[in-house]
């Protein structure tokens, strides 16, 4: 239960700020429903802090829409709710979310091989998403299985945790965590050209282009702090150690972003492979060489 001081602060904030924001949203706004793409936790807390009820859900085309949704009065921030009636959700050993039930398709029409690939036992549909389930059955999505990074040391890293945290920084338009078959985790960062002028003025700096801003010490220091905060949510082996600011704009029109505003990771990595190599001082070692290095490490331990 909030302390008297916190309740007093809430009343002041409501009178001076929150009430005005709610007025912009409209007098009839009571609920906000989010789906289709992950909602950053700070945005979820912001809307909840306005006094609005935020409800999130999760589903795919193969599940006929939502298969998990939050309920009014039972909507913890960060989760996407519990299974819809008649449906069941569990996680595999590797963390992949598996679903079955009345909403789940029986298979892809006329495509038995593709059906077996996603429903090997004929019952549970393998979503390709990674997640966890709490004691009360609330599902939390933590990333995509195909996006898992395996470092040269064999550490599995889910980039979504780091990317979601960094994406909330006003200077960052897009961030992509890298490190597959590399000695450590790194990141490529594209600055937000729209937010940059306001940020520069706020910090007493002359307005300049993203390319020029990339070399400013104040910009670097701000990004360093953001990465330090993001790294607190992961282990040392999973943390970002180096990053590069790239001169790039990713949009739907140029093919780097999907219509649902998701970054096409494979295209970015292919087109910016030179920048990734620069981050690590050269291309990734051949598979045979990586295997020998891992063997030597095991012998040392």
Predicted regions mapped to residue ranges:
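Gly/Ser/Thr-rich phosphate-binding loop
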Residues: 1-75, 88, 173
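Alpha-helical "lid/cap" subdomains adjacent to substrate-binding clefts that gate access
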Residues: 1-30, 193-233
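Ser/Thr-glycine-rich phosphate-binding loops at phosphate-binding pockets of nucleotides
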Residues: 59-63, 127, 151-152, 258
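Glycine-centered loop/turn positions within well-structured domains
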Residues: 75-78, 95-97, 106, 139, ...
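Conserved ATP-binding/catalytic segment of the ANL
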Residues: 83, 87-151, 168
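Adenylate-forming
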Residues: 104, 138-167, 196-217, 236-240, ...
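C-terminal boundary motif of the adenylate-forming
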Residues: 130, 169-195
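Conserved C-terminal "lid"/linker of ANL adenylate-forming enzymes
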Residues: 149, 174-177, 183, 224-301
């Amino acid at each position: 239960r909030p302390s008297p001081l916190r309740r007093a602060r809430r009343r002041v904030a409501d009178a001076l700020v929150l009430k005005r924001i709610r007025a912009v949203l409209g007098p009839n706004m009571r609920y906000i429903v989010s789906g289709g793409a992950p909602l950053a936790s700070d945005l979820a807390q912001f809307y909840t802090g306005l006094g609005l009820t935020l409800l999130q859900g999760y589903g795919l085309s193969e599940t006929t829409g939502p298969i998990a949704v939050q309920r009014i009065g039972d909507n913890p921030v960060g989760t996407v709710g519990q299974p819809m009636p008649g449906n069941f959700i569990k996680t595999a050993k590797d963390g992949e979310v598996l679903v079955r039930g009345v909403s789940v398709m029986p298979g892809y029409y006329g495509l038995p091989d593709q059906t077996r690939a996603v429903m090997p036992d004929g019952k549970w549909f393998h979503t390709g998403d990674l997640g966890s389930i709490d004691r009360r059955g609330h599902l939390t999505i933590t990333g995509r299985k195909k996006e898992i990074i395996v470092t040269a040391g064999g550490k599995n890293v889910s980039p979504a945790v780091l990317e979601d945290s960094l994406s909330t920084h006003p200077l960052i338009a897009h961030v992509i965590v890298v490190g597959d078959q590399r000695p450590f985790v790194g990141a490529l960062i594209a600055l937000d050209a729209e937010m940059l002028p306001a940020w520069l003025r706020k910090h007493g700096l002359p307005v300049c282009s993203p390319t020029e801003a990339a070399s400013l010490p104040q910009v670097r220091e701000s990004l360093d702090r953001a990465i330090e905060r993001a790294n607190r949510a992961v282990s040392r082996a999973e943390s970002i150690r180096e990053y590069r600011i790239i001169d790039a704009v990713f949009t739907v029109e140029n093919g780097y972003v999907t219509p649902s505003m998701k970054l096409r990771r494979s295209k970015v990595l292919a087109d910016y492979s030179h920048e990734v190599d620069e981050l690590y001082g050269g291309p990734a070692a051949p598979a045979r060489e990586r295997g020998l290095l891992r063997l030597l490490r095991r012998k040392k331990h």
